[in-house]
């Protein structure tokens, strides 16, 4: 966190936070002291929470509008997998929470929605998430986060598209037609999963940001 203005020699100089809002890597809570360092402090980037809520709502709306075809194996469970970019990044935390809140799979941890990766959750017994439910056309469907992980490569780079492409290969081998939705904290990882598996299997894939 930034120190208070009175304690810093450059306290009156303009400060710009770019792309990443200062926040707790554990909870995703914004560091308001840093964001209000002085009267010329600015943040240039996304509104993490608003965008996250929109992504979650888009996924939920898609399921409801395509309920006749979305459940690929007809088991009454809408299963999704989630590529998490960086477990300590506030945008990634917000986007994971946004998906889980919209689909009813969120559980609380220390007063906030738990954004930890679930690993695998084939039977719905994970404690990081819970089974959600959606009622559409008089029928109730279970919504389950089948798997999620942080996409970090062996060199330590997060938000890694290649890792996401490998992950969807592993998940599809494990879950097959239980996977009805693929979701990602960003477009790069989402496109990697789409090209590696979703496209050929006609599984809707949701990303986030502005890759061309």
Can you describe what each PLM-predicted range is?
Residues 1-212:
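A residue-level marker of the well-folded mature domains of exported/periplasmic proteins
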């Amino acid at each position: 966190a930034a120190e208070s203005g009175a304690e810093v020699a450059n306290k009156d100089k303009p400060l710009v936070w770019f792309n990443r809002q200062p926040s707790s890597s554990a909870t995703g809570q914004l560091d308001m002291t840093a964001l209000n360092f002085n009267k010329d402090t600015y943040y240039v980037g996304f509104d993490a929470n608003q965008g996250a809520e929109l992504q979650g709502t888009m996924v939920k709306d898609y399921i409801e509008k395509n309920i006749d075809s979305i459940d690929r194996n007809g088991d009454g469970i809408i299963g999704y997998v989630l590529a998490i970019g960086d477990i300590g990044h506030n945008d990634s935390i917000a986007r994971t929470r946004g998906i889980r809140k919209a689909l009813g799979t969120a559980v609380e941890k220390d007063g906030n929605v738990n954004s930890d990766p679930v690993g695998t959750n084939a039977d719905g017994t994970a404690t990081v998430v819970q089974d959600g439910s959606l009622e559409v056309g008089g029928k109730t469907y279970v919504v389950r986060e089948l798997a999620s992980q942080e996409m970090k490569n062996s060199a330590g780079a997060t938000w890694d598209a290649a890792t996401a492409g490998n992950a969807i290969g592993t998940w599809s081998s494990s879950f097959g037609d239980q996977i009805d939705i693929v979701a990602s904290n960003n477009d790069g990882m989402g496109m990697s999963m789409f090209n590696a598996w979703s496209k050929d299997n006609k599984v809707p894939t949701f990303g986030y940001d502005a890759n061309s």
